[in-house]
């Protein structure tokens, strides 16, 4: 089954992203995986999504956060959606 994983229609992933990013900002010495947010759910659907952004973004595969300078930038971000 193909799932829509765009940011505008994937509130679960976006919410997890935001919480994970805030957790990182609060504890810059410890980066957590988005799966930490959803690990208590029995099933999660993960995929890679390409998108352009003008804001800060995080690269979960490298387990680090990068502040992206203003301007369009392509990124591949690991996203998980609670089913």
From Swiss-Prot:
<comment type="function">
    <text>May subvert the host innate immune response by interacting with host IL1B and interfering with its function.</text>
</comment>
<comment type="similarity">
    <text>Belongs to the asfivirus L83L family.</text>
</comment>
<comment type="subunit">
    <text>Interacts with host IL1B.</text>
</comment>
<keyword id="KW-0244">Early protein</keyword>
<keyword id="KW-0945">Host-virus interaction</keyword>
<keyword id="KW-1035">Host cytoplasm</keyword>
<dbReference type="GO" id="GO:0030430">
    <property type="term" value="C:host cell cytoplasm"/>
</dbReference>
<protein>
    <recommendedName>
        <fullName>Protein L83L</fullName>
    </recommendedName>
</protein>
């Amino acid at each position: 089954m193909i799932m829509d994983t765009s940011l505008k229609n994937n509130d679960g992933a976006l919410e997890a992203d935001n919480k994970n990013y805030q957790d990182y900002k609060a504890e810059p010495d410890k980066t957590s995986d988005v799966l930490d947010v959803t690990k208590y759910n029995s099933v999660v659907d993960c995929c890679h999504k390409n998108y352009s952004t003008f804001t800060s973004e995080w690269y979960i595969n490298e387990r680090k956060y990068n502040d992206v300078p203003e301007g369009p930038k392509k990124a591949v971000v690991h996203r998980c959606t609670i089913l």
